A protein has these predicted regions:
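Secreted/periplasmic proteins that engage bacterial cell-wall peptidoglycan
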Residues: 1-100, 113-120
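Glycine-rich catalytic cores of cysteine/serine-nucleophile enzymes that process amide/ester linkages
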Residues: 103
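Active-site or metal-binding loop neighborhoods of secreted/extracellular toxin and effector enzymes
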Residues: 106-138
């Protein structure tokens, strides 16, 4: 199996977030799965080709406590037309194509209160175009 690598869409989004929030907390950031992820299906686990299709951002993006919700919500709305995005989880809610990108209660093990989880589709493996999100433009 090839070495794990974050999909191009994930790399681009991470770079955009880092530029928009250079002093943000990164303690809950991550992309490649740890041992708890490897025991179950997770987009943090590499595909057979080595692609990791998930990235987490610490919820403390800035001094504004609403910034993480605004970011997650803008991603959710963008995902209606950007097929690289698979789903978003934050603060006990999940949005995906299956629910027409409406927030619903997330019932998984981790409510994602300390970080925003974004999963990507296969289209994101090599498509690293920038994401058109107002919060990332300053």
């Amino acid at each position: 199996m090839p070495n794990p690598r974050l999909c191009a869409a994930g790399v681009t989004l991470r770079d955009q977030v880092d530029r928009a929030f250079p002093n943000r907390d990164r303690r809950s950031d991550g992309w490649v799965g740890d041992s708890s992820h490897s025991a179950r299906k997770s987009d943090h686990n590499p595909t057979a080709e080595g692609w990791v299709r998930a990235v987490d951002f610490d919820a403390n993006l800035s001094d504004d406590p609403k910034a993480s919700y605004v970011f997650a919500n803008q991603l959710r709305l963008l995902a209606r037309r950007d097929r690289r995005l698979s789903y978003c989880i934050y603060s006990g809610k999940i949005a995906s194509r299956r629910t027409l990108w409406r927030w619903r209660k997330y019932t998984g093990v981790n409510p994602h209160n300390t970080h925003i989880h974004i999963s990507f589709t296969k289209k994101g493996d090599k498509d690293g175009r920038p994401f058109d999100l107002a919060i990332l433009k300053g």
